[in-house]
Design a protein with these regions (language model features):
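Positively charged n-region of N-terminal signal peptides that target proteins for export
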Residues: 1-5
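Hydrophobic h-region of N-terminal signal peptides that target proteins for export
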Residues: 7-17
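Signature of exported/secreted
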Residues: 18-287
Length: 287
């Protein structure tokens, strides 16, 4: 009898979760709240020169590159105006970036370094799309694409609604995780496929648990002065788990692991193999 009573309590919640509840995944955070994010990216790459002798200390041995970037940022979201547009102030509280070559630290010009301590304003339209990002003139002069960077940092989500077990596909634009000569920015293009695994509750909020896979490629010419250009081909694949706060509309947690393979030709030919892990945590409160 006790088992029947327990089953009668649990079964309705299970059936409700399996009965087709649909949730909307919007890029725009809910109004009137403050969200804090912490993002950590770790990258490890082996680069091997082709047609070179191998052995201790020779040019044919892999060059091991390592990189780590940590970002802490605060987003203060205001109330929507009469047209439904909403603004959010984004402050980059702390940014650190480091790089090593064969274990030895080297200086790096991280693309996010100029953001340290800066404030930007993001604008969302009534449909929840990020339509504009404004920042100090110094950031514009640095060549950083503020809109693209913000979308990358806070998470891209499908704009469609999903029920448990359903999938949605969105286009993907991923910054290449290694510094390029002259500070040039390079991107991989592809797609991400999200699948809604379950919906849970934490207090008064619904938390969507999702898996997603990514597949992106890049084929690009890299100028090398008067000597012409190098051809770089890279493919990046991977997957992630994430928790999305449905009601406050922000990424509560995510853990993404990527693998990339690439080659460079047209000069000293080389191949590369690497891994990248990006972890994010988010928390929200009323202002």
């Amino acid at each position: 009898m006790r088992l029947l009573v327990i089953a009668s309590i649990i079964a309705p919640s299970i059936l409700a979760a399996q009965g087709g509840e649909r949730i909307s995944l919007s890029w725009a955070p809910a109004p009137n709240q403050t969200i804090q994010f912490r993002i950590v990216q770790d990258t490890d790459v082996d680069v091997v020169m082709a047609n070179m002798p191998t052995g201790a200390g020779t040019a044919g041995d892999p060059t091991k590159l390592g990189g780590k970037t940590q970002i802490e940022m605060t987003m203060r979201v205001g109330a929507p105006d009469a047209q439904g547009r909403m603004s959010a102030e984004v402050v980059y509280d702390s940014i650190t970036a480091s790089m090593t070559v064969n274990g030895a630290p080297v200086s790096t010009n991280s693309a996010v370094a100029p953001l340290q301590g800066q404030t930007m304003t993001a604008t969302y339209d009534a449909q929840g799309a990020l339509v504009d990002v404004k920042g100090p003139e110094s950031l514009a002069a640095s060549g950083v694409d503020l809109k693209e960077l913000l979308m990358t940092l806070v998470g891209r989500m499908p704009t469609t609604s999903l029920a448990v077990g359903e999938t949605a596909t969105i286009p993907l634009d991923v910054p290449f995780p290694l510094p390029m000569p002259g500070g040039r920015s390079m991107h991989l293009a592809g797609q991400a496929v999200y699948k809604l695994i379950s919906i849970a509750r934490e207090g008064d909020a619904r938390i969507a648990n999702l898996d997603y896979t990514t597949d992106a490629k890049m084929a690009s010419e890299l100028p090398i002065g008067d000597r012409g250009s190098l051809t770089m081909d890279v493919r990046m694949t991977g997957g992630a788990t994430c928790q999305w706060n449905v009601d406050r509309r922000y990424m509560k947690a995510s853990d993404q692991k990527m693998t990339f393979e690439g080659s460079v030709s047209g000069g000293p030919d080389m191949t590369m193999h690497g891994t990248m892990r990006v972890q994010m945590e988010g928390s929200a409160r009323k202002p």
